[in-house]
Amino acid sequence: MKRTIFLILAVAVLASCASESGRQYANRAEAIAAQMRDPASKYVVVACHRGDWRNFPENSIPAIESVIRMGADIMELDLKLTKDSVLVLSHDANVLRCTNFTKVFGKDKSPKIKDLTYEEIQQLNLKRAHDIATDTVKMPTLRQALACCKDRICVNVDQGYEFYDMVLAITEELGVTDQILIKGKKSIGEVAAHEAKYEHNMMYMPIVDIQKEKGLALYNSYKEQGVVPMAYEVCWGQSNGDFEKIAAEIVASGSKIWVNTIWASLCGGIGHDDDEAYMHENKGDVYDYFLDNGVSMIQSDRPAQLIEYLKSIGRHNL
């Protein structure tokens, strides 16, 4: 019965996307990707940092299912490679924080993912945010995660550019390449040369730390060479006018802006993050700063809160 209800809701959302946008899309992920690529779109794309980690183990299938059902647009996930070359979802290089590794293997075995086989990792149970191990939730492979996300939500592969070739092989096999976003800090030339090897590539977005020398240099290289990416992920730690200036330039260039409200250190300092918004009755006291500066993609640690606010102002209706 629950599955039927979820399917009905999914169909209703998809039908709404088609009617409101004036275009027909094969699935919700395709509709989201279209908004991501459209610099004129006023739709604000919501990305979920490691999924719904407040209620389920981070980077897990239940955490992914939860954000899909709440109406999020992008599932952000992290990748690591096992000893036997299986891509799994993990932010950390080892499994100590997120699994019951010590209980299963003791202290004599290396907890690094690169030292563990996939079979060994499957003996572990993932932990909830409160450090309590689940009974059945395992660390998923990238293939399993993408199969869950396929056509339902777009995916941002974080900490994954080094595995580009492996990731692309999986996305091509599953038919989801156009639904996947990968980001990085490599030069324009490096990215262009690497992607030239393939006929079909994932979406790419440069990360620019505008208050750091290398990050600002990367941003300036795009501007000076006249290269207009789909969007920039902009990071900055102090509100001193730097962001406002560069945001105006980005919007004028025909690109989009992605910001991270997960931590204040990434979005202008204290008073600008999701936890600050949580303390305000009017979430616009925090989020409107970004919207007023042309931001149309936000990675959040409180996606339900952000989605509710965006819907209330007509900025999250496909």
Which ranges hold each PLM region?
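Sec-dependent N-terminal signal peptides
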Residues: 4-13
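Phosphate-group recognition and catalysis centered on beta-loop-alpha active-site segments
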Residues: 17-318
